[in-house]
């Protein structure tokens, strides 16, 4: 599988990525998208949301800080994406706790997102498996992958055009015909908020460049994890680590051989 991935850099066109995300990670996502060579826009007002979605090359929907107005805008943008075949990533933030968010994600499945993303607890909750998630965080008790992989394979038969991206100590990417178990990363990424959201935004970037949902998911989660691995963290504080994550995102794309450092396996 690693050999099947091709280097997406340099970015061929400076795509516009529409992020409907939360206020907490908004700035990090914008800078991360810029670091890869694309352009971000953040618009979630129902009065203008379609103006920006129609100009975009990919849509990223993140359910953090959901409100009634934002939900209305999300539904409008998702419907447009479905009708116009615009690549779409849905990040199921907080569905372990919020019945409103879980219901919204299940409705968004009707719009056939290209990628459905979440942590282990969130995805287990969505597909009806036992979970221990609290708030928006995954539980260490939910890291068993064998039962989850089987259920996700079944879901991919129902939604054949969609890939699942499940983040955790080992990241899972599941599509109708392929499964990847990826092992890059470092625990220090948990030091700062928004890194999971950033993976979703980077997935949208790679979708805008013509990658499949499976390819874009593998590239996005591996790219962030490998960038983080390059940071020397001994004695480093939170803010410096956050700065270096964004710094490495802009530098790693210069390495023509970065794909060779992806750890993991894939099978059909």
Curated annotation (Swiss-Prot):
Residues bound to ATP: 117, 167
Positions annotated to bind substrate: 42, 194
Coiled coil: none
InterPro entries per record: Hyethyz_kinase (IPR000417), Ribokinase-like (IPR029056)
GO biological process: thiamine biosynthetic process; thiamine diphosphate biosynthetic process
Cofactor(s) this protein cannot do without: Mg(2+)
Family membership noted in the UniProt record: Belongs to the Thz kinase family.
Name of the protein: Hydroxyethylthiazole kinase 2
